[in-house]
């Protein structure tokens, strides 16, 4: 078997572990004229799984369209204010979670092949649909004397602009299968997070920064070809010449 010229369509599949960083969150406190930051806003890590279709243009340039799913990442936050009657200082504990679907158009530069290994860099642009579940918050007096009833704010979902930066290396497994190990950074814009309830909200997040460690594989159609049979050259037979 021989490897044909590195061009043609391919399919890809990837899984990854996502170190997610919420760049903060804001909400309207008591009035739509007063927007304040969450005092704490933390998002747990999650997993990603995805796939795509692409085209290897030549030995150095390829492009693909990918669709990925970010599994549930739990949110924990807190805010400070006043609650009860008469009003006393309170701290609110907030809980929610999100998932995200990301669609990207990507381009990569393969930096040459060294043995079986081809390092690359790349970038992508597209959008992410971020879906927040309901946000539940309970406000408790700082002196521990009481807690208000839980308030539930309806979660929001929307599409956000997203870009990606990638680096990694592929390893030739067979003539048409490449293993892929890499890093991807996703920048997801901010958007709506939860709605109004009980004199609080709506709220929005400031966006996500996602650092992914990824492994996957690419299957290149037509990457293998049978070496064609070439018969040995014929040796011309020359009749003897008699003088």
For the regions a protein language model found, what residue spans apply to each?
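Residues on the lipid-exposed face of transmembrane beta-strands in outer-membrane beta-barrel proteins
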Residues: 13-17, 51-55, 105-109, 123-127, ...
């Amino acid at each position: 078997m021989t490897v044909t010229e590195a061009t043609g369509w391919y399919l890809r599949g990837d899984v990854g572990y996502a170190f997610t960083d919420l760049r903060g969150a804001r909400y309207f406190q008591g009035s739509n004229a007063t927007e304040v930051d969450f005092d704490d806003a933390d998002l747990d890590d999650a997993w990603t799984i995805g796939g795509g279709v692409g085209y290897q243009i030549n030995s150095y340039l390829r492009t693909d369209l990918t669709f990925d799913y970010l599994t549930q990442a739990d949110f924990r936050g807190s805010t400070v204010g006043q609650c009860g009657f008469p009003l006393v200082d309170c701290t609110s504990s907030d809980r929610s979670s999100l998932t995200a679907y990301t669609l990207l158009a990507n381009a990569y530069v393969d930096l040459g092949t060294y043995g079986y290994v081809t390092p690359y860099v790349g970038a992508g642009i597209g959008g992410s649909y971020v879906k927040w579940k309901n946000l539940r918050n309970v406000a408790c007096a700082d002196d521990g004397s009481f807690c208000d009833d839980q308030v539930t704010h309806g979660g929001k979902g929307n599409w956000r602009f997203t870009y990606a930066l990638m680096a990694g290396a592929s390893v030739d497994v067979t003539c048409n299968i490449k293993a892929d190990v890499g890093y991807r950074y996703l920048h997801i814009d901010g958007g709506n997070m939860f709605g109004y309830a009980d004199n609080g909200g709506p709220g929005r997040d400031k966006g996500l920064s996602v650092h992914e460690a990824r492994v996957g594989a690419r299957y290149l159609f037509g990457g293998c070809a049978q070496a064609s049979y070439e018969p040995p050259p014929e040796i011309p037979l020359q009749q003897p010449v008699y003088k």
